[in-house]
Design a protein with these regions (language model features):
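Extracytoplasmic "Venus flytrap"/periplasmic binding protein-like
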Residues: 57-127, 162-171, 267, 275, ...
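Glycine-centered hinge/linker elements that transmit conformational signals in sensory
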Residues: 181-182, 225-257
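Short, solvent-exposed loop/beta-turn-alpha elements that line the ligand-binding surface or hinge
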Residues: 113-127, 197, 214-240, 288-289, ...
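Extracytoplasmic/periplasmic solute-binding protein
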Residues: 139-147, 152, 177-230
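Extracytoplasmic/periplasmic substrate-recognition and gating elements
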Residues: 56, 60, 140, 164, ...
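Long, aromatic- and glycine/proline-rich binding clefts that accommodate carbohydrate-like moieties
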Residues: 126-132, 297-298, 346-396, 400, ...
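Short, low-complexity disordered leader/linker segments with a strong preference
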Residues: 1-37, 60, 118, 424-432
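Hinge/lid segment of periplasmic solute-binding proteins
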Residues: 99-152, 205-206, 295-297, 362
């Protein structure tokens, strides 16, 4: 999930020496007053608002339960969870990222198959559930109840497009470069990049774009071969995609300070920039600033018209396997599958991962329509389905490709070297 991953993966590599206190391991009666503790690492994003409002609604239905939502620092969140699991002093429920993150930490999580009624699980988008299950197969049972469906996505200013004479949203590299030329001539920054909006530090996060470059290069059924190494990171197709990406800056499609610009979100909100690549967690911010001028587009990082979109349940809540309040924790997870919960999540500007629900935000609904009406293939977030060490290396190397500081081959070779250094159990021909 989004831009915290590289720091979190690094911090979680070593357990803290001592565990955090005041967790869910304290004793408590299931019939008397119960305090249910939830840890989250959302910071100030819309997800935090949604979770707090879910907690309030749950408390209203369960008068004996107090839900204590604890905001933990994002930079060492998973190290805190691991340390607390050792001493069993952690939370009852915890925000957990999906994909390989879930499988990495499943030793202290509860598989929810048979714990939550099948009818409740059936209300959840099955594509969301599978990415929280062993072998990414929902039949094996999820470890996470997803909070929302997330998109890595492009946003564009319709008024800027109209003024510049861009009559159609670009769908491939050639059309994108042509649109950039018109937007620049009209006085706009075509695409804004930078490190603004990152919860942790001033770092450019390349995996939104990298996901779309790999969508342009490979079918979703072949993405596992990036994990296994059957498709080398240094493949000609990958190098060609990164070479095109680097042209965005060299051809004047972006700001010159792509790695260090801190107000890139402000450039888009103010109308100075015509496009940016971001995610659903900022949709409400953009619609509040730009109203009907803002719309979503699929980043067209492909030689032929792009046919895939990143549609992925990036996080949700897991129950720890040492909680002493499992009855109440499971009730909360069941509540997350209801239509009432979906309304709360939608009200926070997010997309509920519940079957049959929609979103009141028109830009979020546009993203859903890419799959449901335009029949684009839904892809996961690439940084959730390749190894954390490879993600870390890519986060260090890939930004310099866009900046023109290093070649695509150099960055991809570093990623390939990192992959080759992993034990064979971490790069098999199937997911763990």
């Amino acid at each position: 999930m989004r831009h915290w991953k590289v720091l979190a993966a690094t911090a979680a590599a070593a357990l803290l020496a001592t565990a955090c206190s005041s967790g869910g391991g304290s004793s408590g009666s299931t019939s008397g007053p119960v305090t249910l503790t939830i840890w989250e690492n959302y910071g100030t994003e819309q997800n935090a608002t949604a979770l707090k409002n879910l907690a309030k609604a749950f408390e209203a239905q369960h008068k004996n339960v107090t839900v204590n939502v604890v905001s933990q620092p994002a930079d060492n969140y998973f190290a805190l969870l691991q340390a607390a699991a050792v001493s069993k002093t952690g939370p009852d429920l915890a925000v957990m990222w999906t994909g390989l993150f879930t499988l990495q930490y499943k030793e202290f999580l509860t598989n929810l198959k048979g714990k939550i009624p099948a009818a409740d699980l059936a209300r959840i988008d099955p594509d969301a559930l599978k990415w929280t299950s062993d072998q990414f197969n929902a039949a094996n049972g999820p470890y996470v109840i997803p909070l929302e469906n997330q998109f890595y996505i492009g946003f564009y200013n319709k008024a800027a497009f109209a003024k510049a004479g861009v009559t159609a949203v670009p769908t491939d590299w050639t059309q994108l470069f042509a649109a950039c030329k018109k937007l620049k001539a009209a006085g706009y920054m075509p695409l804004t990049y930078g490190n603004g909006g990152q919860p942790l530090g001033a770092e450019f996060y390349p995996w939104y774009d990298m996901s779309y470059m790999m969508i342009g290069a490979h079918a979703v059924t072949n993405w596992q071969q990036l994990y296994s190494g059957q498709i080398p990171w240094t493949s000609a197709a990958n190098q060609a995609q990164l070479a095109q990406w680097a042209k965005l800056k060299s051809n004047g499609c972006t700001n010159s300070d792509v790695l260090t610009k801190t107000n890139n979100l402000g450039d888009f909100e103010s109308g100075k920039a015509a496009m940016m690549v971001d995610g659903t967690w900022d949709t409400q911010k953009f619609t509040s600033a730009l109203g009907s001028k803002v719309a979503a587009f699929v980043p067209p990082f492909s030689d032929s018209p792009i046919k895939g979109v990143v549609d992925f349940a990036g996080d949700g809540l897991s129950m720890t396997n040492y909680t002493q309040h499992s009855a109440q924790a499971l009730q909360f997870l069941e509540f997350m599958t209801t239509s009432q919960a979906a309304k709360i999540i939608n009200a926070a500007g997010l997309i509920p991962a519940i079957n049959g629900t929609s979103t009141s935000n028109p830009v979020n609904q546009q993203m859903l329509n890419f799959v449901s009406q335009d029949h684009m293939t839904a892809y996961p977030m690439l940084d959730n389905v390749v190894q954390g060490n490879v993600v870390n290396t890519g986060s260090k190397e890939l930004p310099s490709v866009l900046n023109g500081s290093i070649s695509p081959k150099s960055a991809l070779s570093s990623m390939q070297t990192t992959l080759g250094q992993l034990p064979s159990t971490q790069r098999g021909t199937s997911y763990p």
